[in-house]
Regions:
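Membrane-embedded beta-barrel scaffold of Gram-negative outer-membrane proteins
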Residues: 4-14, 18, 39-96, 105-112, ...
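C-terminal beta-signal and adjacent terminal beta-strands/loops
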Residues: 176-177, 199-261
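Outer-membrane beta-barrel translocator domains and adjoining extracellular loop/strand segments
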Residues: 23-32, 70-79, 83, 119, ...
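Transmembrane beta-strands of outer-membrane beta-barrel pores
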Residues: 15-21, 28-30, 53, 64-68, ...
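Gram-negative outer-membrane beta-barrel transporters
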Residues: 64-66, 88-180, 256-258
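Transmembrane beta-strands of outer-membrane beta-barrel proteins
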Residues: 11-13, 47, 58-60, 112-114, ...
């Protein structure tokens, strides 16, 4: 749905709903149960405003999306030990978010894409009955989904020196992300940066050079293994300890060439 209030300004909205039954790999290790036969439903609703003129295309929208009956086999570890067990989980997730994006062309050859998102992805019906004596059950209802930041931003300027020679930069910000289900451990926000040049030499040859992480950001991301049941009151015990996880891509130079016939 799109409705123009003026020549440049208007309203937009749309909605979709997708459904499917669980995939065969989601039965792995447990065999089918009555709960696992339930249909997965993914509704999406969004609406907002847009403004367009000769040099800018601006859109701001509110979005709601959810997914029911996620099937997961969560490996949980008893805090402070190496004991672990696999638990079958069937849960829901939902998020309400606000996104504003802009496509800007200030002068010939220059283009800027910018995007900002604030969202709150949360778990619903997420309950783990602790398989370990002395370790409390986990109720993650209302907790922020791990590995998903609440704040996202993108800034992507580019400039075509000639129709065949293009310079570009990309700045991507990921806000604070939680590293476990209880939201006891988290990673601070970070920037990921890229830049490069692309040259179409002729119809057969294209050359490129890319710089990854040119701001030389350092840090970790993802999850922390073995921390699924760790409570907030216990999180301090892990300060200054080495733990496994993912790391940001280091400063890297990449060169490419492609041939087409």
């Amino acid at each position: 749905f799109t409705y123009k209030l003026t020549r440049n300004f208007g309203l937009t909205a749309d909605g979709t709903i997708a459904t499917r039954f669980p995939r065969i790999n989601e039965y792995a290790g447990t065999g089918p149960t009555e709960e696992q036969y339930k249909r997965v439903t993914i509704p999406l609703l969004r609406g907002g405003l847009f403004y367009q003129n000769d040099w800018i295309n601006l859109t701001s929208m509110i979005t709601y999306i959810s997914k029911s009956n996620n099937i997961d086999q969560q490996n949980v570890t008893k805090p402070g030990t190496t004991q672990s067990k696999t638990t079958l989980l069937i849960y829901d997730i939902k998020t309400l978010g606000w996104t504003t994006s802009a496509e800007i062309n200030l002068f010939k050859g220059f283009h800027l894409h910018a995007l900002f998102t604030y969202q709150k992805p949360t778990y619903n019906n997420y309950f783990i009955k602790s398989p370990f004596e002395g370790v409390p059950d986990l109720n993650a209802n209302g907790n922020i989904v791990k590995e998903i930041p609440q704040v996202l931003a993108e800034i992507d300027p580019s400039y075509n020196i000639t129709p065949d020679l293009r310079l570009w930069l990309s700045f991507r910000y990921f806000g604070k992300t939680y590293a476990n289900l209880t939201n006891a451990l988290y990673f601070n926000g970070r920037w990921e940066t890229f830049g490069g040049i692309n040259w179409k030499v002729n119809k057969h040859l294209s050359l490129g050079a890319t710089v990854v992480n040119f701001l030389n950001q350092k840090g970790a991301s993802g999850t922390i293994n073995g921390a699924e049941l760790l409570g907030k009151e216990e999180a301090g015990k892990f300060k200054d300890h080495y733990m496994s996880g993912n790391y940001l891509r280091p400063f890297t130079l990449e060169f490419s060439a492609s041939l087409s016939f």
